[in-house]
Amino acid sequence: MVPQVHQVGDQVEVIVSDNCSTDETSEVVRWAQQYISIRYHRNSTNVGSAANYFILTDELARGEFGWLLGDDDLIRENAVTSVLDAIQTNPTIDYIFVNHSYELITEREKKGDLVTGADFPKLGDLLCYETQNHVVLRWEEIVRFSRTPALFTSIVSSVFRLSRWKVESAKIKLDRDDSFRSLENTFPHLCTVARMMIGKPAVYLGYPYVILFVGGQNWFGDWPTMLFVHVLKIADLFAELAADKQLVACYRNTLFEHSAWQFRQLIFYPTPLSRDIFSLRKLVARYWNMPTFRKMCWVAIKLQLSESWIGSLERAILK
């Protein structure tokens, strides 16, 4: 990021909100401040990731647009200039969607501490398969470009006009003690953007300018629960905001078509969170009429039976 920000000068404001970390964040910031201007803020306590997002956007940021990046995320060459160009070319549009590719966090760890986007030249798996840049007439139409469940849940996907964002973010009531138990406390950024953008035009940047690393998140083990509790509620939110019914159905179908493994984990290997907030009975009652849901259920059962059979065979051979 440092060379890219240095290239554009004062067009970009970089803010680091240190959520009371115990690592070397402050030392890294001091190093980077030799080359670019960075505002550094440290929370006195760990306020949770969601609240930290809102501290950045609603209290610290002074620019016209905001782009949230996590501490593990990397950006590829020309990411900053491409976003700036999209903003300048489309002055009346409030939102830019940025595509990203996925890498395992273990691949990043193999390369040491000092890594950049250039260390991952292969694009890998993409969030959205559409790689051309264009304007969509309605933000929610981006749903058609992805076969990945949980589109829009990554903070890195969204570049947004802060004045419009703050109108909606002010309505979000965060409760750290309720983290991951409600849609707003799990994906407050998505709730904010959806209420801000449903039915409105957006810029779509199809090239994966961001590299998102998966597997290191402290909530990763509860991802199956989040998928089948909160991500399904995102489709409900879209419907409440009068999104096209076909797009709402597409969002749900994408989840069911590509989440059999996660469903199997949720059903056969429950976690404390899933026991607390997930109901299989309610899920089946609501979605059994959808062919994609029924197929996912059968695939999940087959996966479990297959693994059980293989495990039994291996134990028999070892004997």
What do these predicted ranges mean?
Residues C191-A194, I198, A202-K319:
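C-terminal subregions of glycosyltransferases and related glycan-biosynthesis enzymes
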Residues M1-L227:
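Nucleotide-sugar donor-binding/catalytic module of glycosyltransferases
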